């Protein structure tokens, strides 16, 4: 098992998570005793204890006082916060993960974009006004796109959408910079922003779902043209930190 890590705690965390991912510690199984596991990984028991607590908070493990630590089925117990970890574990499957991520975001964003234009159209107009000074660079578009989604999610009337977006942030920022490196993708997005601005100024939230659906289809087609050339390094947290 080859693991790149910045320190003992990072190494221990990646060792345990990869062992769970590769079914060496399958769901429902009991982890080796703390002393045995610390010797196996090569870290102190104090470091291991901190790592186990962190993994339990993320849903990988179940720790109960006086009982051995049990491995969870992370698909049932973890949240969006492990997306980055899954990308790290399976870079070959990263394009499919991104497909699923973008599909989920498109479906959810149609709800909070409509809610934002209904509940707070002035906020939408204000954030959309920034498109007229937007630099034509991948970084600027990626940052603005996230800002737009975050602002509209917060003003939609349901702040839970913001928490969902936060779970996407790390991966989406990296993928966004790659996606918006295409001038065609930037132009497609800019046209969408302008159409959304027209709706916001007219306080027309009714037509938002249709606009979102059209943009989702067109941006999805654009993504399919770009995904096969995406560098695998985008999947790795260490390479992008």
UniProtKB/Swiss-Prot annotation:
<comment type="subunit">
    <text>Homodimer.</text>
</comment>
<dbReference type="GO" id="GO:0019217">
    <property type="term" value="P:regulation of fatty acid metabolic process"/>
</dbReference>
<dbReference type="Pfam" id="PF07840">
    <property type="entry name" value="FadR_C"/>
</dbReference>
<dbReference type="GO" id="GO:0006631">
    <property type="term" value="P:fatty acid metabolic process"/>
</dbReference>
<keyword id="KW-0805">Transcription regulation</keyword>
<keyword id="KW-0010">Activator</keyword>
<feature type="DNA-binding region" description="H-T-H motif">
    <location>
        <begin position="34"/>
        <end position="53"/>
    </location>
</feature>
<keyword id="KW-0678">Repressor</keyword>
<keyword id="KW-0238">DNA-binding</keyword>
<dbReference type="InterPro" id="IPR036388">
    <property type="entry name" value="WH-like_DNA-bd_sf"/>
</dbReference>
<dbReference type="InterPro" id="IPR014178">
    <property type="entry name" value="FA-response_TF_FadR"/>
</dbReference>
<dbReference type="GO" id="GO:0005737">
    <property type="term" value="C:cytoplasm"/>
</dbReference>
<dbReference type="GO" id="GO:0003700">
    <property type="term" value="F:DNA-binding transcription factor activity"/>
</dbReference>
<keyword id="KW-0276">Fatty acid metabolism</keyword>
<dbReference type="GO" id="GO:0000062">
    <property type="term" value="F:fatty-acyl-CoA binding"/>
</dbReference>
<comment type="function">
    <text>Multifunctional regulator of fatty acid metabolism.</text>
</comment>
<dbReference type="GO" id="GO:0003677">
    <property type="term" value="F:DNA binding"/>
</dbReference>
<dbReference type="Pfam" id="PF00392">
    <property type="entry name" value="GntR"/>
</dbReference>
<dbReference type="InterPro" id="IPR000524">
    <property type="entry name" value="Tscrpt_reg_HTH_GntR"/>
</dbReference>
<dbReference type="InterPro" id="IPR036390">
    <property type="entry name" value="WH_DNA-bd_sf"/>
</dbReference>
<feature type="domain" description="HTH gntR-type">
    <location>
        <begin position="6"/>
        <end position="74"/>
    </location>
</feature>
<dbReference type="InterPro" id="IPR028374">
    <property type="entry name" value="FadR_C"/>
</dbReference>
<dbReference type="InterPro" id="IPR008920">
    <property type="entry name" value="TF_FadR/GntR_C"/>
</dbReference>
<keyword id="KW-0443">Lipid metabolism</keyword>
<protein>
    <recommendedName>
        <fullName>Fatty acid metabolism regulator protein</fullName>
    </recommendedName>
</protein>
<keyword id="KW-0804">Transcription</keyword>
<keyword id="KW-0963">Cytoplasm</keyword>
